[in-house]
Curated annotation (Swiss-Prot):
Species name: Bos taurus (Bovine)
Protein name stated in the entry: Gap junction beta-2 protein
Family matches, as InterPro entries: Connexin (IPR000500), Connexin26 (IPR002268), Connexin_CCC (IPR019570), Connexin_CS (IPR017990), Connexin_N (IPR013092), Connexin_N_sf (IPR038359)
Family recorded in the similarity comment: Belongs to the connexin family.
Broad class of where this protein is predominantly found: membrane
Gene: GJB2
GO cellular component terms, A-Z: connexin complex; plasma membrane
Length: 226
C-alpha cells in the first residue's frame, strides 16, 4: 500500500483543518502508520510459520490457525486505517471542487476577488463554513464510528486484546484436542494494546473536534441578527 500517497492527500486536507484536526493527523501517521509499517510487520511477519501445534495431522495446524486468527492483525489494522482515512478524502474532494468552481468563475469574470491569478486561488485556505462545514463535520462523525467499530471487532474476533500463549483446538481434521503455541505473545500483546490505545486517543481527538465545531456553529448562529 502507498502510505506516502495517502499522506500527500491527507496533508492537503490538513491545511484546512482545525488545530485539533492537525493533531489527529499527526497521531495517525506517527503513532499508527509508522508503527504499522516499521515495527508491527516485523512482529507479525512469522505468525503462521511459527504457530506450532503438537500434532502431525495434515491440515490441523492450518485449520487451527484460521480458527483463532481469521484475519491477520496487520491486515485488519491496515483496513482500519483505510476506513478511518476515507472520510478525510471526502473533505479533500469537496475542497478541490470548491476551488475548481472558483477558478472557473474567476476565468469567466463572474466573480470579483482579491486574487490576481489562479495560483493564488490554489493556495487559498478554505474556511470550514457552509457546505464544507457539513462535509467536514460528517467526516469526523464517521471517523468516530469506524474507530469504535474496529475496536469492537478486535475485541470480539480475538476474545480480548491480550494474545494467548497457548490455545486449544479440536476443529476438524484434528484427531483430538491439540495444544497450539503462539509466537511472541507478549510482544504482540504490547503492540495490540498500543494500537488500541492510540485508536482511543484518536476517538477522543475526533469527539473534541466535533464538539468544538458544533459550539462554533451554534455561537455563529446566535450572533446573527434576528
Amino acid at each position: 500500500m502507498d502510505w506516502g500517497g495517502l499522506h500527500t492527500i491527507l496533508g492537503g486536507v490538513n491545511k484546512h483543518s482545525t488545530s485539533i484536526g492537525k493533531i489527529w493527523l499527526t497521531v495517525l501517521f506517527i503513532f499508527r502508520i509508522m508503527i504499522l509499517v516499521v515495527a508491527a510487520k516485523e512482529v507479525w511477519g512469522d505468525e503462521q510459520a511459527d504457530f506450532v501445534c503438537n500434532t502431525l495431522q495434515p491440515g490441523c495446524k492450518n485449520v487451527c490457525y484460521d480458527h483463532y486468527f481469521p484475519i491477520s492483525h496487520i491486515r485488519l489494522w491496515a483496513l482500519q486505517l483505510i476506513f478511518v482515512s476515507t472520510p478525510a478524502l471526502l473533505v479533500a474532494m469537496h475542497v478541490a471542487y470548491y476551488r475548481h468552481e472558483k477558478k472557473r468563475k474567476f476565468i469567466r469574470g463572474e466573480i470579483k476577488t482579491e486574487f490576481k491569478d489562479i495560483e493564488e486561488i490554489k493556495k487559498q485556505k478554505v474556511r470550514i463554513e457552509g457546505s464544507l462545514w457539513w462535509t467536514y463535520t460528517g467526516s469526523i462523525f464517521f471517523r468516530v464510528i469506524f474507530e469504535a467499530a474496529f475496536m469492537y471487532v478486535f475485541y470480539v474476533m480475538y476474545d480480548g486484546f491480550a494474545m494467548q500463549r497457548l490455545v486449544k483446538c479440536n476443529a476438524w481434521p484434528c484427531p483430538n484436542t491439540v495444544d497450539c503455541f503462539v509466537s511472541r505473545p507478549t510482544e504482540k500483546t504490547v503492540f495490540t494494546v498500543f494500537m488500541i490505545a492510540v485508536s482511543g486517543i484518536c476517538i477522543l481527538l475526533n469527539v473534541t473536534e466535533l464538539c468544538y465545531l458544533l459550539i462554533r456553529f451554534c455561537s455563529g448562529k446566535s450572533k446573527k441578527p434576528v
